[in-house]
Amino acid sequence: MNMFSSFFPNKEHDLDGRTLKQRFENSNNGVLVDVRTAPEFNNDTIPGAINMDFMSPGFQKEVEKLNKEKTYFVFCRSGGRSSAAASVLRKIGLTSFNLIGGIGAWPH
């Protein structure tokens, strides 16, 4: 492990905006998940995304209701909350990917 590995994620589930958008568009079962707060979501989001506030007390219960047949593409403002949320999804057996850099990294 070199000194830069902690600064630059090299995980197969952490994707740049172009790659994540491409995988989502090519997926026949993909779900975009905005894990920001409701006010953030209502202000601006990626069209078609659902909102699941990672910081809400009910987040874990919402996650447990998700369809295991779907693939989840998770994002937030900067990539921190979504990285943690995507990890939670994977821990319960869901397929999920994190948008590195957050909503601003999504290509328009």
Which residue stretches match the model-derived regions?
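Catalytic cysteine-centered active loop of the rhodanese-like fold, especially the PTP/DSP P-loop
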Residues: M52, E64-P107
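Glycine-rich, highly charged phosphate/nucleotide-binding loops
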Residues: M52-G58
